[in-house]
Amino acid sequence: MTAAAVSTTRTLLSGKPLRALAALILIVNGLLPALWILLTSFKTEAELTQKPITWLPHAPTLQNYFQAFSDQPLLTFLFNSFMVALLSTILTLFISVLAAYALARLNLRFRDLIMSLIIAVSTFPLVTLLVPLFETMRALGLLNTWTALILPYTVLSLPVCTLVLTSFFESIPRDLENAAMVDGCTRFGALFRIVVPLAAPGVFTAGILAFVNSWDEFLLALSFNSNPALRTLPVGIQLYQGEFAFPWPVISAALVVGIVPVAILIVIFQERVVSGLTAGGLKG
């Protein structure tokens, strides 16, 4: 093989075609399951089990969606999930903004150690925290309440949100908030009037991450709540299956209904989320 051929091969392997292929694989891997769930929600039980398996429904029906709302209190599940996720996100953002600002601006003696601990805590498997969290919630008398989910969800989302916001705050020039403080603004005032508005993409990114994390969580919602009126969507969806029956079209319809709010949220704020994920890594 000539030197020119070797150079061309290296360019192809390390250039745009390889990156495009990797991106395509990731997109297909993420979209195919969602597409299958969407199409299944319009199929009948008989059509789903027929051979050979077909992707597109022969006679699309909305009956599964009507049944999803009639078989279980799906609206109640959606409301509970939305309120828990919203309140958890607000609390997470407030705490993570303060923590990230301290890490980004204050000359903390053990800053590197704190950052390392934040990263380490974020890697803990949720199942290892289940018993301690359950005992804590029981001791506080918070079981079967929204608070029993809001507090753990906040704690679980804080590490990632703090890291995202710390990186973003570090990219904002100090001169802007210093000028505000010279004009009589307090440090808290400079944070919420200057830094947070400039860091809006990062704040939106952290908020989306916290909201989705709370919206999708199943284990804690199942373990900390036995009140049917307070069940969240992930726990409610598993109630559609019977002891010997798995109505996959109805379950798929309920899943689609649960995906729609998050999908709308991401579509609306996608530009801010993308800029928040990328701009935080730029200094100056």
Where are these regions (language model features)?
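Short, Lys/Arg-rich, polar N-terminal cytosolic tail immediately upstream
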Residues: 1-13
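A structural signal for multi-pass alpha-helical bundles of membrane permease subunits
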Residues: 15-284
